[in-house]
């Protein structure tokens, strides 16, 4: 019985950790979803549409970039900046010093804008949903994405 409990704890720990295999999978699937050019705009639109459908009040956090119209040039530029930052974080998952520097910078930017802690899990859920929809549910590993995205978001949210 003790062995079973220890095994269950190890499985739970491994699932919560962004392992090297998780990082490889997330990087590959992110590259597929992020793509280039208009693919990036489509991925961004999927993320923001999902986020705002689930958290309509979040639009107010983006008034500076015309958050009421995700198709506006101001919001599209913001969306591409967010995806660019996420792209750098995903690319740096296996380079801890670089990732930590990126996360520290993103943390200071988000702190100065007063982004509430409640918004981060919603963004993670929307980003994961958008990537899954883009790469296909059959090959998508939700545990890998959750563990690696939580590592990124915990660094941004402090």
UniProtKB/Swiss-Prot annotation:
The record places domain Globin at: 17-158
Localisation per UniProt entry: Secreted
Among its keywords, does the record have Cell division? no
Task: Report the SS bond pairs.
Answer: 18-148
GO molecular-function terms, A-Z: heme binding; iron ion binding; oxygen binding; oxygen carrier activity
Q: Where is the signal peptide?
A: 1-16
Q: Which CDD domains does the annotation name? A: Mb-like
| Residues given in the record as heme b binding sites | 110
What this chain does, per the entry, is described as: The extracellular giant hemoglobin is able to bind and transport oxygen and hydrosulfide simultaneously and reversibly at two different sites.
Q: What family, per the record?
A: Belongs to the globin family.
Q: Give the protein's recorded name.
A: Extracellular giant hemoglobin major globin subunit A2
Organism the protein comes from: Oligobrachia mashikoi (Beard worm)
Q: Which gene encodes it?
A: ghbA2
